[in-house]
Amino acid sequence: MNSVRAANRRPRRVSRPRPVQQQQQQPPQQPPPQPPQQQPPQQQPPPPPQQQQQQQPPPPPPPPPPLPQERNNVGERDDDVPADMVAEESGPGAQNSPYQLRRKTLLPKRTACPTKNSMEGASTSTTENFGHRAKRARVSGKSQDLSAAPAEQYLQEKLPDEVVLKIFSYLLEQDLCRAACVCKRFSELANDPILWKRLYMEVFEYTRPMMHPEPGKFYQINPEEYEHPNPWKESFQQLYKGAHVKPGFAEHFYSNPARYKGRENMLYYDTIEDALGGVQEAHFDGLIFVHSGIYTDEWIYIESPITMIGAAPGKVADKVIIENTRDSTFVFMEGSEDAYVGYMTIRFNPDDKSAQHHNAHHCLEITVNCSPIIDHCIIRSTCTVGSAVCVSGQGACPTIKHCNISDCENVGLYITDHAQGIYEDNEISNNALAGIWVKNHGNPIIRRNHIHHGRDVGVFTFDHGMGYFESCNIHRNRIAGFEVKAYANPTVVRCEIHHGQTGGIYVHEKGRGQFIENKIYANNFAGVWITSNSDPTIRGNSIFNGNQGGVYIFGDGRGLIEGNDIYGNALAGIQIRTNSCPIVRHNKIHDGQHGGIYVHEKGQGVIEENEVYSNTLAGVWVTTGSTPVLRRNRIHSGKQVGVYFYDNGHGVLEDNDIYNHMYSGVQIRTGSNPKIRRNKIWGGQNGGILVYNSGLGCIEDNEIFDNAMAGVWIKTDSNPTLRRNKIHDGRDGGICIFNGGRGLLEENDIFRNAQAGVLISTNSHPILRKNRIFDGFAAGIEITNHATATLEGNQIFNNRFGGLFLASGVNVTMKDNKIMNNQDAIEKAVSRGQCLYKISSYTSYPMHDFYRCHTCNTTDRNAICVNCIKKCHQGHDVEFIRHDRFFCDCGAGTLSNPCTLAGEPTHDTDTLYDSAPPIESNTLQHN
């Protein structure tokens, strides 16, 4: 490529004389016989048909004359071409034609008056040769039918296509268009795409047609896929009137006016500066073609609506390079509202990469009140200050599309100071700083950009920067894919933000923004970070497969997290900490490798109407002084706990559906004191609610049912309050209190549970007040194993085994209780002499007097009911153990002698009943 250094000079004004007529080509050494001379029609009228037939026939046609050798000789004619050469061939001679080329079918002879010999005289204008049809004679009376001139007939009807095309290949575009006006055949041949492609590439160099259907719009096409039959000609017409910057060609062009006759609408210059001045002085449309080459240190300040486009074969932008080493390569100033620059490489390559004394540090600078179009450009900068593209100032509103802004040692695209603009389909990659900066009320529209592999953040909006980002692909940047800071407020819609080496979206220091319907995935840190009083809107996004969490809100962060699909992340789907208080609603948080929502370190927030399911750890964690409000969520199908309060976790859990967890629906431990009300908790494999290790809590108005173990567990010094709950249809007991558990149970309905409505054991001491315990399949209340209780105003009725059972050594405080209408199945079985094993089940054990038999060598772990002692062990050495809850080992068939009362054994368990202990969450092992 040529390297051109501009000279500061005015555009050269070169006179362009008309082309000089070339010398007529010499005829062959043995010219054919000359036809008889014809007189002009003005001097002699044409002979009648009878007289023409009497004339002497012409000699046989000679070979065709040689083709012209020079382009500017194509228009010349041979005065000595015989008329016989163009006579119609007939008879046997037609079969021995010297041409073995294809011919056009002869057209019907036209009726016309004879004209001046069309081959007579030489002229440089092809219009005179091919442009005139035969004139009709003006005669009085009836008109006569006369045949066309023989030469015209030969050219139009009999000359082979290949010969015509060869002749046409020497014509320039205007003469070719004139030839197309001669006849239908010439029109078809003159529009041959190969002819126009050759002309087109000679002028514009493009190897594919460059279409220019309207101002500011250029695009290349594949000719075979274009609907127009001749896209080369169509593009030629669209691009015809323009100036060309082609170093070294201008002198040749203006020195050969005859060779380029008809191209007066084309101007040629050696430098871009000359072309900019020339098109303005010549009042052209401002279309400038910059041909292949490297143009260095030109002063390109554009302040008019010019159009500048690269012109080169192959990949155009790679062949046309404009470079500056001192100041901004291109500067668009006020007045360049509709300017266009496209299909070229623009470089800023200063000698001192970090020099601070540069007046400007940009490849391309767009200033106030201008809206140019930058299209299909490659933009590079090696300067470590400034940016590759800078758009600044009120009214700066460019359109930058299909550009490649990459490998720059600074910011790729910088939009600031109220600038706007449309930026579409650009490739922005591998820049040392952010791919895009938006600052100080800049408000661009950025669509379908590919922003990747940056050595910093992908997009950085800060200091009140705004913008609308749509359908961008942002990935593999060293820091976050998208960063929002310091009151910036962008809108990001339907983008893909993924594979960030840190996070996906980072909003901090009072940043805002709307992030809507994006795909955020596979980032090394959180998909979305919100911190330090920031308040963005995160709506309708898919946030998945992150190497850490989904959404991470900390440091007084806020925000609306709504309608997102958050799944498959390595840590919690949403994490809220350190006084953060977001609104989290209508999200799906599922299939995480950790928990669903994790609120800790005094985190807050309103978490409502979410669906949290199928997570490996707890659906929701609340810990370390946090106080969120969880309302109307569906938390289900987890592999551990549904909602887990621990280490002083607080908050409100209300109106939620919590079901089908492998552990408990809710666990409360270690000083946690939540308010749990109006929830439905069912399907837990380890019970409904487990309160342990000094857990607290106010549990009110809940419905707790169909759990595999107890509806509510209270153990290990825990002291919750349960009011107005309905605890029913459990596959174990209603409420189990043991290991020093306490609590206030007030106004609850406890019914239809498989074991005791309330079981109190192992040094526990709860208060039961005004509860209704009924329709149980075992006892109403059982108190055993040195436990105590205060029972006030309870109603205990219609339970199968009985109302209240107290084991040996148990002392309770009772007041105003009503124990009535229970079925007393144990007493009835004893009175009928039945083995009490008959009324036991795998998990339901009757409370009565139990013994051991020394004769049968029973151990401390064996117990025998009173009827088996009387019948099966009559006369044996027996010992009373205590009045407590056992099943009969004699009836179960576990002793050496068979039971004579039980018959065939129907149970196979010898486990002592103390209600199988609940499984405590091991979530802490994963913190």
Swiss-Prot record:
PbH1 repeats: 395-417, 418-440, 441-463, 464-486, 487-509, 510-532, 533-555, 556-578, 579-601, 602-624, 625-647, 648-670, 671-693, 694-716, 717-739, 740-762, 763-785, 786-808, 809-830
Domain of life: Eukaryota
Effect seen on changing residue 684 to E: Found in a patient with lymphoma; strongly diminishes ubiquitin-mediated degradation of BCL6
SUPFAM superfamilies referenced in this protein's UniProt entry, alphabetically: F-box domain, Pectin lyase-like
Stretches annotated zinc finger (UBR-type): 833-904
Keyword Zinc-finger part of the UniProt annotation: yes
Pathway listed: Protein modification; protein ubiquitination
Compartment(s) where it occurs, according to its Swiss-Prot or TrEMBL record: Nucleus; Chromosome
Biased composition (Low complexity): 17-27
Main localization (coarse): nucleus
GO cellular component: chromosome; cytoplasm; cytosol; nucleolus; nucleoplasm; nucleus; ubiquitin ligase complex
Any one Gene Ontology BP term: protein modification process
A GO term for molecular function: ubiquitin-protein transferase activity
Listed Pro residues bias regions: 28-68
Alphabetized SMART domains for the sequence: CASH, FBOX, PbH1, ZnF_UBR1
Alphabetical keyword list: Chromosome, Disease variant, Intellectual disability, Metal-binding, Nucleus, Repeat, Ubl conjugation pathway, Zinc, Zinc-finger
UniProt-reported outcome of changing residue 575 to L: Greatly reduced ability to bind PRDM1 and reduced proteolysis of PRDM1
Sequence ranges of Polar residues compositional bias: 114-129
Disease: Intellectual developmental disorder with dysmorphic facies and behavioral abnormalities: An autosomal dominant developmental disorder with variable manifestations and onset in infancy or first years of life. Clinical features include intellectual disability, speech delay, hyperkinetic disorder, hyperactivity, seizures, pre- and postnatal growth retardation, microcephaly, and facial dysmorphism.
PANTHER family with a match to the protein in the record: F-BOX ONLY PROTEIN, F-BOX ONLY PROTEIN 11
Protein name, UniProt field: F-box only protein 11
